[in-house]
Structures are given as structure tokens and as C-alpha cells.
């Protein structure tokens, strides 16, 4: 199946679930070609949200990455600028969670950068739900359910880039059959 636009499938890791209080600590994305859904490019950055070593240490433990990785990470403003520079705002955004979109919008707002993506977002959860209904799967279509169904191995459930790549594979399998 061919699409009108390239698809930018993104995933995030956050300090918690509350958009107004918590922060993105990893932003990752894979750009899928509109013609064949193969990965054209990718983006991955951890985000330093605190200068306190104990807070950074907690985030590093949560993400299962070395403390030094987060300590040396760029701030949110720099990450969002790099994200825009890499992909622009023309691809169609895709993600597995509406809250991911809300967190991304909030990140743009916090950095005073314009959020210029199309208001239409490809919702992988809904696509997965329809797929599971069609094939009679009895589980809710979480990403883990779909990873298991398609025999995809996830090594770190808190790695946004790994989740983005596995989500892209799920998307390809659902769309291409």
C-alpha cells in the first residue's frame, strides 16, 4: 500500500503519565517511506530534564541506560529543534498512544516552538484494535500484544527507539498483510 506522505512513527519515554507535570526523557522516531514503508531515517535522543544527580539517576534506572548518558543529554529545547531540523513538519505523524501526541505538543509548547504537524495522526492503537477484532485475538491491542502476535522480540521495554522500530514492523505487517 502506498501513502500520500512519508510516515513519522514516534515513541517517547516520560517521567510519568501526567502531561502537565511529567516530562519526556527520550524522544525517538523512524521515518517510513510512503511507497514501501521501509525506514528512511531515524531520530533518537535522551533528554536531560534535571540538574540534580539523584533525579537523573532515577531516570537512568527507569530507562535502563547509564547515568552518564542522561547526564550528558541535551535539554528539551535542543532536542525539539533537532527533531524539526531532521524531519520538518511534512510527514504524517504516527504513534501508538494519544498521550504521546499530547506530550509532543506540550514539548513544543514548553520550548516556544510552533507545532506545525497535520492534526491528523495515524493511530496505531486503533489500527491494532481493528486487526485484533478481525483475527479473533482476545487480548487488547497493546504494543506488547502485537509484538507477541507477530513474534517480535523487545529487549528493553523502556527504549523508545526500539519501540518505534518494532511499531513500524507491526504497522508494515498489518498494512501489507
Describe the predicted segments one by one:
Residues 2-8, 13-101, 148, 158:
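Conserved non-catalytic scaffold segment of RNase H-like nuclease domains
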Residues 12-14, 124, 164:
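Generic detector of well-ordered alpha-helical packing
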Residues 22-25, 106-110:
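Short, glycine/charged-enriched secondary-structure capping and boundary segments
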Residues 108-119:
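A short alpha->loop->secondary-structure connector
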Residues 115-117, 137-140:
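Short conserved catalytic/interaction loops centered on acidic-Pro-aromatic/His motifs
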Residues 91-98, 103-108, 141-177:
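Acidic, Mg2+-coordinating catalytic module of metal-dependent nucleases/exonucleases
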Residues 121-137:
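Short alpha-helix plus adjacent loop in nuclease-associated cores
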Amino acid at each position: 500500500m502506498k501513502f500520500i506522505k512519508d510516515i513519522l512513527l514516534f515513541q517517547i519515554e516520560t517521567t510519568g503519565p501526567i502531561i502537565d507535570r511529567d516530562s519526556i526523557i527520550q524522544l525517538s522516531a523512524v521515518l517510513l517511506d510512503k511507497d514501501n514503508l521501509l525506514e528512511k531515517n531515524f531520530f533518537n535522543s535522551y533528554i536531560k530534564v534535571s540538574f540534580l544527580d539523584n533525579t537523573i539517576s532515577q531516570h537512568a534506572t527507569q530507562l535502563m541506560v547509564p547515568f552518564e548518558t542522561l547526564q550528558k543529554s541535551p535539554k528539551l529545547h535542543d532536542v525539539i529543534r533537532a527533531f524539526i531540523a531532521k524531519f520538518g513538519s511534512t510527514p504524517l505523524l504516527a504513534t501508538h498512544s494519544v498521550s504521546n501526541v499530547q506530550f509532543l505538543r506540550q514539548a513544543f509548547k514548553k520550548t516556544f516552538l510552533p507545532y506545525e504537524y497535520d492534526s491528523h495522526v495515524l493511530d496505531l492503537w486503533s489500527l491494532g484494535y481493528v486487526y485484533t477484532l478481525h483475527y479473533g485475538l482476545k487480548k487488547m491491542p497493546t504494543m506488547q500484544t502485537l509484538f507477541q502476535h507477530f513474534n517480535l522480540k523487545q529487549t528493553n521495554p523502556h527504549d523508545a527507539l526500539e519501540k518505534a522500530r518494532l511499531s513500524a514492523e507491526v504497522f508494515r505487517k498489518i498494512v501489507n498483510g
